[in-house]
Design a protein with these regions (language model features):
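N-terminal cap/lid segment of alpha/beta-hydrolase-fold proteins
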Residues: 1-21
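Short beta-strand element of the alpha/beta-hydrolase
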Residues: 25-33
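The serine-hydrolase catalytic nucleophile loop
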Residues: 35-45
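Conserved alpha/beta-hydrolase
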Residues: 50-67
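Catalytic nucleophile-loop/oxyanion-hole region of alpha/beta-hydrolase
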Residues: 66-91
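Alpha/beta-hydrolase fold nucleophile elbow
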Residues: 94-102
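Gly/Ala-rich beta-loop-alpha elbow adjacent to hydrolase catalytic centers
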Residues: 101, 105, 109
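Conserved small/polar residues in nucleotide/adenosyl-binding loops
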Residues: 114-117
Length: 117
């Protein structure tokens, strides 16, 4: 069974995450698509694949998606980018990571990365 957790983005705003920490030197970060969540085939497959190959895995649901805070219609690209940056900084810190994105996530990945530095 997959265990999802929450991380506080702000005082009362929780983001749902899936973080499989296996003490690897690399973390695969999966960013889902628009109006999607982490319970689909792609994130669950990647999580299983990473566990099997002893690689850390991280995914999150942006604001207004899945069980994270907020309503979808109030979300913005900037807000979702900030969600991604926050989770990467908080969980991965300075470790190496590889971003894999689907649909919107494929766009948020590079946009978030350029704002991490």
């Amino acid at each position: 069974m997959t265990k999802f957790n929450y991380i506080y983005f702000k005082k009362d705003k929780k983001l749902r995450i899936l973080n499989s920490k296996l003490n690897s030197k690399l973390t695969v970060v999966f960013l889902h698509g628009l109006k999607s969540d982490m319970e689909g085939k792609k994130p669950l497959f990647l999580n299983r694949y990473c566990k099997k190959n002893k690689v850390n895995f991280l995914s999150l649901e942006y604001a207004g998606h899945g069980k994270s805070y907020g309503k979808f219609e109030n979300g913005t690209i900037s807000q979702w980018r900030n969600n991604v940056k926050f989770v990467i900084r908080k969980i991965i810190k300075k470790e190496k990571f590889l971003i894999i994105g689907s649909s919107l996530g494929a766009w948020l990945g590079p946009v978030s990365y350029t704002h991490l530095e």
